[in-house]
Design a protein with these regions (language model features):
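Propeptide-to-catalytic entry region of secreted or membrane-anchored zinc metalloproteases
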Residues: 28-178
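Stable alpha-helical elements in mature extracytoplasmic
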Residues: 98-102, 227-231, 301-304, 317
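Structural recognition of the beta-strand scaffold that forms the well-ordered cores
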Residues: 78-85, 134-137, 182-187, 208-213, ...
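Sec-exported extracytoplasmic/periplasmic mature domains
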Residues: 104-115, 237-244, 313, 317
Length: 347
């Protein structure tokens, strides 16, 4: 009886802890991509130069007008995705259906096919864009074996920080697949952090995005973050976009058609919310690169589309993804080696 009582108390305490973490995350969308970038640059000073070189490449592509303007199926970039799910508690071991819902949310956002695009204010609608970028779970792994594109690993780590340790098996995480062929997404317990993205020009083994398990996919029960748009925001970073306010007061995100704004917006604003002399339109708080609730985010702009797609031009950082074998028929029609119980957990 005593043992059962203790187990019941333990389960109750775990539930309370998860509820507290959920409330803390729901209070504000906490993307730490900028602070992560600054930390990585402080560790590796050359990273800033590599990042600047990529930004210069993008500017040159845009200046030359060489970003693909064609429309139709051939102009849609398809990105193979591998999702690394790291769980300690059963609630963190998200289902295939939850993963599918996130891929669907990414595709609807980047193709502007969400029903809530009808909520875009009339003065911003002419700027909204179908980015013609799609995402698909990989069907071939780096060894050309068949895969579901989903990896699950039990880990003894209960909480992760934005320090990339979840990206390495040696740290009880999961190693990245070749970043030239796949978008790596790690899903784990980040506590109060919603997610973050790697830095352009950073190490290949760290390339990708990390999302808190409670903000991944749709209908998660996480109030304000249950439509999969945290991942949309972080993939925006992964494709070169910055926060609208340029991470400083009235800063510049480098995109001509996004109005300057004083800082991030939260919750679900309405009407014109003016700052930084943008009174004619106000802040573009419904843009995916702000911090508003999922239900209030519904657009990327044409300028953001052009910048993201410039990375896929010949010689661009993301160009190799277009020739990835991740979406090609696997040569070996068998599942990869079991990954539910990695060797470092065998007893």
């Amino acid at each position: 009886v005593t043992t059962n009582y203790l187990e019941t108390m333990k389960a109750g305490l775990i539930g309370i802890i998860f509820s507290m973490a959920a409330l803390q995350l729901a209070a504000q969308k906490n993307c730490v991509s900028h602070s992560y970038e600054q930390e990585q640059i402080s560790i590796d000073r050359s990273l800033k130069d590599r990042n600047n070189a990529i930004e210069s490449f993008v500017k040159n592509q845009l200046a030359q007008g060489s970003v693909l303007r064609t429309e139709g199926a051939e102009s849609v970039f398809k990105i193979p995705v591998v999702v690394h799910i790291l769980y300690h508690y059963p609630s963190e071991k998200i289902s295939d259906e939850q993963v599918y819902s996130q891929i669907d949310a990414l595709n609807k956002a980047f193709r502007r096919k969400n029903a809530d695009t009808a909520n875009t204010p009339s003065w911003f609608r002419p700027l909204a864009a179908d980015c013609e970028i799609e995402f698909q779970l990989a069907i071939s792994d780096p060894s050309c074996r068949s895969t579901s594109g989903i990896i699950r690993k039990y880990t003894p780590i209960k909480r992760w920080e934005a320090n990339d340790k979840m990206k390495f098996s040696s740290e009880m995480g999961s190693d990245a697949w070749d970043s030239k062929s796949y978008l790596n997404i790690w899903v784990c317990n980040l506590e109060s952090v919603a997610g973050y993205s790697s830095v352009m020009g950073g190490p290949a083994e760290k390339d990708g995005i990390v999302i808190g398990f409670s903000a991944f996919g749709t209908n998660t029960g996480m109030a304000g973050y249950d439509m999969g748009k945290t991942a949309v925001h972080e993939v925006g970073h992964w494709l070169g976009l910055r926060h609208l306010w340029g991470d400083e007061y009235c800063g510049d995100d480098g995109i001509a058609d996004t109005p300057k704004q004083a800082g991030n917006n939260v919750g679900c604003p309405t009407g014109i919310r003016a700052s930084c002399n943008n009174g004619s339109t106000g802040d573009m708080y419904m843009n995916y690169m702000d911090f508003t609730s999922d239900a209030c985010m519904n657009l990327f702009t044409k300028g953001q589309k052009e910048k993201m797609r410039a990375l896929f031009a010949t010689g661009g950082l993301r160009n190799p993804l277009l020739s990835s074998k991740g979406l090609q028929m696997p040569l070996i029609m068998e599942s990869p080696l079991p990954e539910q119980d990695p060797k470092w957990l065998e007893v």
